[in-house]
């Protein structure tokens, strides 16, 4: 089958890889000059299934009001003047109760755990290297309340069979030795030993090269004007003076998917702006061994080979990509506070990107009402974490194979009022 994939970020490229491996003739179209040039370029570097959780959580509405008056707030909202933004925020608020949070986090963890397993299989099969580490993730708590609140997330981890360790502050240095110098600032941490890290852009570029060698065609510097449709199917992609035709079409345009699908499929994917710093390492012993997540500021600090990646923040501001100095100062503040000897901050590269977020935090993967149009978008801050699993899942569904995990509650159909998902089965249980 001829398949056109729109988008060459990590989600688009993994989709191309798995569809190609399934025997399809795949073409990837992107306006950029190469893969992973936008949202996948400089994310936090975490592959953290256990921390897969929606921003829509109990208490967030009140916290958002408080954050409005804080200098280093993890979330900021600025109206962009569109009704869509207001509708999206209202849908997000409706998911900020315990029932929705547990349901959304459960399916996010399900897909993310599967994705991590798919990445392991891919790595073993291809030998792909991307400055990856398999050292786990450590979520750091600065208050006693945060430590106590971890029990809510632990319940989801146990239900999904995700191994974990709840550590007191005195034990954090066993996992991240450099934290011994700042343990007095912390109350404890939640460690997920099976989590991984890696350079998402490097992975995407190298996998794209492998995919091309396997027969995938990449059409870079090719802006897409619109999808052409009639009745219940898509019949082409209009690019300037050319119409590119295929048997099936996959939308993986990230935050730009919503506009491209206007009038065709209504999906609630909105850009969530994030920032990162990439810092050269000065003292390896003063840098993280793997990756940490600061629960207070929602900022991740990740070790690559010779660099530290500091990523976080969430701005609901539309498609604005201005680099704002106050957010750089927040990233600098957190990394100085936790790893003061780790990197040369003055030489850091400052970056921003737009993560495609749904109101419930779960991506949109699967079929649409158009028989040859498929979606793989809306992964929010977890595109790197969920990319391989989403790509394999999409390939299985499109190819008529039975996927390894339940998937009906990942489709756009879940936003219908009459939607009733099949309850996923518990896979296993293990923790320490």
UniProtKB/Swiss-Prot annotation:
Q: Which domain of life is it from?
A: Bacteria
Q: What molecular function terms (GO) are annotated for this protein? A: D-amino-acid dehydrogenase activity
Q: Does the keyword Oxidoreductase apply?
A: yes
Alphabetical list of InterPro entries matching this protein: DadA, FAD-dep_OxRdtase, FAD/NAD-bd_sf
Record keyword Protein biosynthesis present: no
GO CC annotations on file: cytoplasm; plasma membrane
- Binding of FAD occurs at 3-17
**Keywords tagged on the record:** FAD, Flavoprotein, Oxidoreductase
Reaction(s) catalysed (UniProt annotation): a D-alpha-amino acid + A + H2O = a 2-oxocarboxylate + AH2 + NH4(+)
Primary enzyme class:
oxidoreductase
Give the GO terms filed under biological process for this record: D-alanine catabolic process
The record's Gene3D superfamilies line, in alphabetical order, gives: D-Amino Acid Oxidase, subunit A, domain 2 (3.30.9.10), FAD/NAD(P)-binding domain (3.50.50.60)
Q: Might you give the EC number(s) for this enzyme?
A: 1.4.99.-
Q: Identify the cofactor(s).
A: FAD
How far does the signal peptide extend, from start to end residue?
none
Pathway, according to UniProt? Answer: Amino-acid degradation; D-alanine degradation; NH(3) and pyruvate from D-alanine: step 1/1
Q: Which HAMAP family match?
A: DadA (MF_01202)
Q: What does this protein do?
A: Oxidative deamination of D-amino acids.
Q: Which family does it belong to?
A: Belongs to the DadA oxidoreductase family.
Name of the molecule in the record: D-amino acid dehydrogenase
**Gene source species:** Salmonella paratyphi C (strain RKS4594)
Source taxonomy: Bacteria, Pseudomonadati, Pseudomonadota, Gammaproteobacteria, Enterobacterales
């Amino acid at each position: 089958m001829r398949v056109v994939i729109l988008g060459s970020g990590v989600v688009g490229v993994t989709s191309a890889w798995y569809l190609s491996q399934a025997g399809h003739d795949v073409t990837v179209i992107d306006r950029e000059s190469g893969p992973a040039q936008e949202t996948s370029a400089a994310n936090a570097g975490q592959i953290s299934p256990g921390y897969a959780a929606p921003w829509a959580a109990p208490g967030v509405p009140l916290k958002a009001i408080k954050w409005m008056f804080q200098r280093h707030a993890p979330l900021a909202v600025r109206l962009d003047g569109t009704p869509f933004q207001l509708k999206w925020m209202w849908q997000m608020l409706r998911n900020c109760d315990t029932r929705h949070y547990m349901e959304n986090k459960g399916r996010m963890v399900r897909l993310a755990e599967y994705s991590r397993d798919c990445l392991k299989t891919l790595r073993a099969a291809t030998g792909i290297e991307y400055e990856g580490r398999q050292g786990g993730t450590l979520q750091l708590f600065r208050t006693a309340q945060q430590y106590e609140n971890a029990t809510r997330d632990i319940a989801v981890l146990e239900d999904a069979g995700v191994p974990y360790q709840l550590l007191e502050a005195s034990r954090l240095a066993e996992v991240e030795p450099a934290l011994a110098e700042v343990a007095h600032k912390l109350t404890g941490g939640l460690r997920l030993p099976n989590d991984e890290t890696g350079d998402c852009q490097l992975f995407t570029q190298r996998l794209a090269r492998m995919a091309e060698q396997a027969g995938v065609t990449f059409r870079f510097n090719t802006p897409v004007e619109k999808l052409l449709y009639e009745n219940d199917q898509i019949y082409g992609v209009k690019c300037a003076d050319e119409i590119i035709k295929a048997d099936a079409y996959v939308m993986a345009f990230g935050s730009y998917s919503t506009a491209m699908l206007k009038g065709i499929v209504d999906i609630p994917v909105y850009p969530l702006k994030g920032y990162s710093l990439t810092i050269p390492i000065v003292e390896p012993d003063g840098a993280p061994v793997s990756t940490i997540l600061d629960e207070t500021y929602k900022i991740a600090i990740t070790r690559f080979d010779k660099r530290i990646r500091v990523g976080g923040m969430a701005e609901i501001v539309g498609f604005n990509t201005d680099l704002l100095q106050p957010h750089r100062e927040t990233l600098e503040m957190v990394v100085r506070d936790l790893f003061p000897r780790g990197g040369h901050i003055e030489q850091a590269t400052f970056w921003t990107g737009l993560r495609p977020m749904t109101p419930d935090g779960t991506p949109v993967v699967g079929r649409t009402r158009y028989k040859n149009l498929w979606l793989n978008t809306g992964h929010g801050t977890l595109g790197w974490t969920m990319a391989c699993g989403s790509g394999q899942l999409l390939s299985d569904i499109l190819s008529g194979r039975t996927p390894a995990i339940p998937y009906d509650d990942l489709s756009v159909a879940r936003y219908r009022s009459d939607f009733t998902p099949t309850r996923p089965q518990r896979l296993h249980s293990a923790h320490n």
